Amino acid sequence: MSGPNIVTPAGREHTDIRHVDETQLIVDDAEVADDDSSELGDSIASSQQTTSSIASSIWNFQLENGRTYHRYKEKKYQYPNDEKETERLDLQHELCLLTLNRTLGLAPPNDENSKVNRVLDLGTGTGLWAIDFGDVHPNAEVLGVDLSPPAAEAPSNVGFEVDDVEEPWTYTQPFDYIHSRFMTSSISNWDQYIQNSFDNLTPGGYFELLEVGGQLQSDDNTLRPDSAVVKSGKLLREACAILGRPFQSIPSLVDVMKEVGFVDIVMTKYKWPMNSWPKDPKHKLIGTWSLHNNLEGIEGWTMAAYTRALNWKKEEVQAFLVDVRNGLKDKSMHAYMPIYAIYGRKPE
């Protein structure tokens, strides 16, 4: 199978790492006392029911503390897969599109004119990224894999498999583009994960990560260390480490990519404001979506992690999250979550 028809400088085999940080965010003082709008539903793609070739037993999910989780490889992944999480993942997909200026990624295969044949979406979630990519590239064969089956209608060139990406990869043909989004705290061995991606690419193919930094930051020291928001992040990182899938230092993955053989590596940093505290319209909008993503996701991110690893009770988690949610809305803390897009090319 031939690789994607992407023009690159002849003989370019060096590693070109570009760290791009967006300009420092300015506080919108007029908005400090206001609440973020909750009317986002009309622009969030809702999941649709469809038939599937996946065995019915896969749909037999596990109920735990009021949330459902994947049955296949039970308890390996600590985040839920129920309708509430599905809706949040769809919201998060829109947040990613806002961040990347309505593109699905920064790697060259995302150019609508690129000729890409086989594409793999790791940890596909609700499958929206794979579906969107398949719509833009109707001649590409797109495969999304996850521990839970997506429940979205897909075009004929997009398929889904329930699989564990940490097991040996058994694909019979390589891919031209492998995409991975928000897998930190879900992977136990990143060296192997990236090696598998490299090994399953065609020469000249691209691997791309979009990852969350995992720890809130502020440029003006307004993020209070004793706040419930900061405490919740520390506890989550502690729990994920105990569960064997710790949060990663995302910039360090550039070195891993270099070691396995990727070249032309580019890393771009973005900022997701904690709420709508920034003044500029783009980051204010991203902050509004980010707040809703966090408010909808915080229980799912913490419930299994805290109860399984830290031995909290369900009621303790819920009581703690009252303060966390209030903290997320606090516009006096000019916090943001760093988001990293990293891609590299397998040499010809």
Language-model regions, residue ranges each:
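Conserved alpha-helix/loop element of class I SAM-dependent methyltransferases that forms part
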Residues: 83-118, 128, 132
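Class I SAM-dependent methyltransferase SAM/SAH-binding core
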Residues: 113-177, 192-195
